[in-house]
Amino acid sequence: MGINLKVSRPKAGSNINMSNTFHTIGLIGKPNHKGTTLTLKRLHHWLSMQGYKVLVEERVAGELGPQVQSVDLLEIGEQCDLAIVVGGDGNMLGAARVLARFSVGVIGVNRGNLGFLTDLPPDSFEEALSKVLEGEFEIEQRFLLEAEVHRHGELKSSNTAVNEAVLHPGKIAYMIEFEVYIDDKFMYSQRADGIIISTPTGSTAYSLSAGGAILTPNLSAVILVPMFPHTLSCRPIVVDAASIIKLVVSPHNSDNLEVSCDGHVHLSVLPGDEIIIKRSQETLRLVHPKGHNYFHVLRTKLGWGSKLF
């Protein structure tokens, strides 16, 4: 399956290609985290000594001292050629939902656990990052999902997700009822704890834990994974990313529900609402060191067996 990604209109100073050099670099990280702060300080000093203009996201700027230039996340997207996110995949997801609106490249320094989206080691990032800054890098484009909640034909709320959009009952797990339509074609009705709609990026996250397949990042596809369905015959299904997925919530559900985007943003859902999930026009531009191997990442993070011969 091919992938046909639409890239947001380039902003001044942030159109990345292999012949360009980086001039302005943004630093983003998890606030009030000792390890992250140490790495951000090293990065800021190291980049500044090499003559780069460095902007620091306002939530962590105060931890680096008064000499840093503090900006918000939108300004990093508008002004920077490259954004470096220090933290785990959760920090990367939060930044990515905003930065995907722009053409800025994004690379991660892993200060979390698995770190599927964060390539650089925190204690020895200099060698790999030097090569990236010299032009030895690859850009991988990851599409996002857009989730919309409609009530009585009116759009009530929406947001984007890098990993997944999840319909679920909220803080206490219980069985809910809903119908699933693909491009206005009825697929099935479901009694379950919810359903996960995941991108290839998210297929190694919540979707994987719920029994979904891993989708390689170049696939133009999404996977629907029921959560504890009350049937033995319902299984995850992969559909084209161009599909419009509609979830119709039964009016007989007794309590309010939620659609969670990457586990960070929560959209309120009432009985009878319709949720539309579709591919977003926004695209995350992940920057990897040259020679990046997705299967090496899977093998390392998931403990797969190494080559025998």
UniProtKB/Swiss-Prot annotation:
One of its GO terms (biological process) is NAD metabolic process. SUPFAM superfamilies: NAD kinase/diacylglycerol kinase-like. It catalyses: NAD(+) + ATP = ADP + NADP(+) + H(+). Its EC number is 2.7.1.23. It is an enzyme of class 2 (transferase). GO terms for molecular function: ATP binding; metal ion binding; NAD binding; NAD+ kinase activity. GO terms for cellular component: cytoplasm. Coiled coil: none annotated. The keyword Nucleus does not apply. Keywords: ATP-binding, Cytoplasm, Kinase, NAD, NADP, Nucleotide-binding, Transferase. The active site is at residue 89. It is found in: Cytoplasm. Pfam families: NAD_kinase (PF01513), NAD_kinase_C (PF20143). InterPro entries: ATP-NAD_kinase_N, ATP-NAD_kinase_PpnK-typ_C, NAD/diacylglycerol_kinase_sf, NADK. NAD(+) binds at residues 89-90, 163-164, 191, 193, 204-209. Its cofactor is a divalent metal cation. Belongs to the NAD kinase family. PANTHER family: NAD KINASE (PTHR20275:SF0). Involved in the regulation of the intracellular balance of NAD and NADP, and is a key enzyme in the biosynthesis of NADP. Catalyzes specifically the phosphorylation on 2'-hydroxyl of the adenosine moiety of NAD to yield NADP. This is NAD kinase.
